[in-house]
Amino acid sequence: MKNVRVKALAQWVSNVTGNRDGLVPLPVEASARRFYRTTLGERSVVVMDAPPDTEDNAHFVALSNCFRHAEVSVPEVLASDLERGFLLVEDFGDNLLEQTYGLGQDNKVLDLALAMLVRIQGISDPIIPAYTAERFSAELGIFREWVLQDLIGVSTLPFDDV
């Protein structure tokens, strides 16, 4: 099934971009999504395979548009096939903040990050769901499992009452 999906994705990318160079896999993350890199003309772009049975791709596109309208730096969705979960998005490259801003510029990075968080917090749009106690509890559960237990191997007992 996976090979069939990758072939369908590669064909879609070829149809959309005219690029027949293929897809270069990017590191996997903790989701059903898979990412690849290819080219569109002279620039690099990211191809996202986000199976629609597990990913809300229409919401992803809507959030991207919402954030871009609010001048929050997020990748532009260049093309999509929401029924199949194929998206072509702007490539921000491989540079991390710590690589972009040299040693000793920690405050500059923190200031930029905080300014962006303030901008995001100020967005009032129905596309952004309210942050509920249930959502917080679910995310705290992920933190307990992935970070505390799996990543650093500590007991979650101090957090059980939160």
Predicted regions and their residues:
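Juxta-kinase regulatory segment immediately upstream of eukaryotic protein kinase catalytic domains
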Residues: 1-21
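A generic alpha-helix signature
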Residues: 4-8, 58, 161
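Residue-level detector of short coil/turn "hinge" positions at structural boundaries
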Residues: 20-21, 74, 156
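ATP-binding glycine-rich phosphate-binding loop
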Residues: 21-36
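ATP-binding pocket architecture of kinase catalytic cores
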Residues: 36-137, 142-145, 149-152
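Central P-loop NTPase core of STAND/AAA+ ATPases
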Residues: 154-162
